[in-house]
């Protein structure tokens, strides 16, 4: 990934970056509070933000991201809301597993499948919009 800036626990990923790699923020940036992802990013790798327990805000573009890897946000216990890009077609297994503060999820019409345990352990979930385009929801979700 291209060089990015973190200031006051806020990461701004530069335009031109196409992928956030597997486990990228998971091990070294646990105090990260916010991340802004540009439209050039098409893939968020598996476990990219795994256990980033301080992460409160993810600003994603409305389009661009096509793939969000399994367990990408597992254990992000401070995350409250998520609006997925209109270009995502599948919510992978355990994507938001144990995001215990997650209250609202907006799933776009482009999504056709929700993987197992995608929202397992999201004990504060108040609202989730599942469009008619979703034809498969795996068990334990």
Language model features with spans:
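Structural signature of tandem-repeat unit edges
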Residues: 2-19, 29-43, 53-67, 77-90, ...
